[in-house]
Amino acid sequence: MSQSKPTVNPPLWLLAELTYRCPLQCPYCSNPLDFARQDKELTTEQWIEVFRQARAMGSVQLGFSGGEPLTRKDLPELIRAARDLGFYTNLITSGIGLTESKLDAFSEAGLDHIQISFQASDEVLNAALAGNKKAFQQKLAMAKAVKARDYPMVLNFVLHRHNIDQLDKIIELCIELEADDVELATCQFYGWAFLNREGLLPTREQIARAEQVVADYRQKMAASGNLTNLLFVTPDYYEERPKGCMGGWGSIFLSVTPEGTALPCHSARQLPVAFPSVLEQSLESIWYDSFGFNRYRGYDWMPEPCRSCDEKEKDFGGCRCQAFMLTGSADNADPVCSKSPHHHKILEARREAACSDIKVSQLQFRNRTRSQLIYQTRDL
């Protein structure tokens, strides 16, 4: 029996992917492989109109992301406009291109929160992963400058098989920098990370050791009165049930790409679903009425075993993008789930990780030339 149309609440979190331009070449970047096709970017006025519409709908948090959002010269103006509208604003940055004068301008414009990402705890590995020899010292300097301006000190480390074994040193660096919050996020396999999965996915043993390191540090830090919050995000490739991706399709999160495509999650543009542009439809119409945003809302779309599963209200059938990447159909159950007929895809990935000997230098790095080669090859 068909269920009633699901209740749709406003999007609480808006992510503005301002640009795909970036000075780094991280091989786990979540940007689309064909980002080099996407040269157009919304203008300052167009972005502010997106913010205005989202705020009118009830959005409360706005993240500035990319690529590297610092490449936008109008970033202070965008921050000020968002602040004037009443958003809580968050800058998600590599720190490359950040200066003390820019920090002062952002503070004056009303920026609430800055998150700086690192690739590793040491300069050599950081340079190898970022493709930039000067990145590490710049990140250190800007992390200290952020702290000096009384922003919440939030550091992000993407963990994978090449840096997860230095987790103790990573945490020590965060303590040294007096971080308030540390996101230790094991690589999520979308975009460039999926392309490099065999060379990035940690082994089960590495994950287990990392969990123990985090647990030990939490205990040690609590005993010493250190209030730094360590958030450790494990890869769902070693779980038996999928994550409730984005809190459910089209439930709380709305992303807008550099050229204006509206998406229910960062990776959804790869799906064989037409997603509308903010240049052609209002944000309200896109959120409530568009086919793309309604495609996987509720439960009626679900095949078995999801449809009759007593956990469907918790995980929503898992990740649609992951189902598409691993099975060829976004309608299928997320293969992470042990009930999925495609769970063997996850088991194969685990076996690959256990045997992989791919070095950092052998990864496919995210850059414009590589992106052009990838989509030219796929167009043949």
From Swiss-Prot:
SMART domains: Elp3
Pfam hit, one: Radical_SAM
Keyword match Translocase: no
Keywords: 4Fe-4S, Iron, Iron-sulfur, Metal-binding, Oxidoreductase, PQQ biosynthesis, S-adenosyl-L-methionine
GO terms under biological process: pyrroloquinoline quinone biosynthetic process
InterPro entries assigned: 4Fe4S-binding_SPASM_dom, Aldolase_TIM, Elp3/MiaA/NifB-like_rSAM, MoaA_NifB_PqqE_Fe-S-bd_CS, PQQ_synth_PqqE_bac, PqqE-like, Radical_SAM_PqqE_MftC-like, rSAM
Required co-factors: [4Fe-4S] cluster
This enzyme's EC code(s): 1.21.98.4
Reaction catalyzed: [PQQ precursor protein] + S-adenosyl-L-methionine = E-Y cross-linked-[PQQ precursor protein] + 5'-deoxyadenosine + L-methionine + H(+)
Binding-site list for [4Fe-4S] cluster: 22, 26, 29
MF (Gene Ontology): 4 iron, 4 sulfur cluster binding; cyclase activity; iron ion binding; oxidoreductase activity; S-adenosyl-L-methionine binding
Cofactor notes: Binds 1 [4Fe-4S] cluster. The cluster is coordinated with 3 cysteines and an exchangeable S-adenosyl-L-methionine.
Pathway entry: Cofactor biosynthesis; pyrroloquinoline quinone biosynthesis
Family indicated by similarity: Belongs to the radical SAM superfamily. PqqE family.
Subunit structure comment from the entry: Interacts with PqqD. The interaction is necessary for activity of PqqE.
Protein name: PqqA peptide cyclase
Gene: pqqE
